[in-house]
Amino acid sequence: MKIDRVKKAPVPAISGEDLVATVSGVSKYARVEVDNVSNVPSDYMGPPRWIALTNEVNRALAWPEVAGVIISHGTDTLEETAYWLDVTINSDKPVVLIGAQRNASEPDFDGPRNLLNAVRICVDPQSKGKGAMLAMNIRSMPLAMLPKPIRPALKPSGRAISGFSASWIMIA
């Protein structure tokens, strides 16, 4: 996401290649290949796009030289996509979703750091068999281990973060 000067709002603007290019040192961990599956706001995600994403990820994970798949995703529906992938992926190889709390127009954009952490997770043998994982804010954990926050009086916590579902990144 970057701030569109006309709309004055974040819009999908970064390809997987753009994101990988922002990370120095990735090549010392893995050879990275990018496939831009879509570039839409994450609130456009739903069953038809999840099915297409699952098919692409399963196809990539079937290749013996692929160690894992990283999916760059907006935060609006990140948890729904992660859950979907957790129950539909047919591999014990890591599938790591990354998001960002800051968009690419901000000087402290956290997407590159999250990507580097996801690459490290994909090449770590201990990551096999953990299902869909999330790498964000210098933390990583399997989706099944994510804590459910307790909301006071069961009130929703509203959020105004915009996101996108850009690409999956194969780690070979």
Language model features with spans:
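Active-site histidine-anchored catalytic micro-motif
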Residues: 1-172
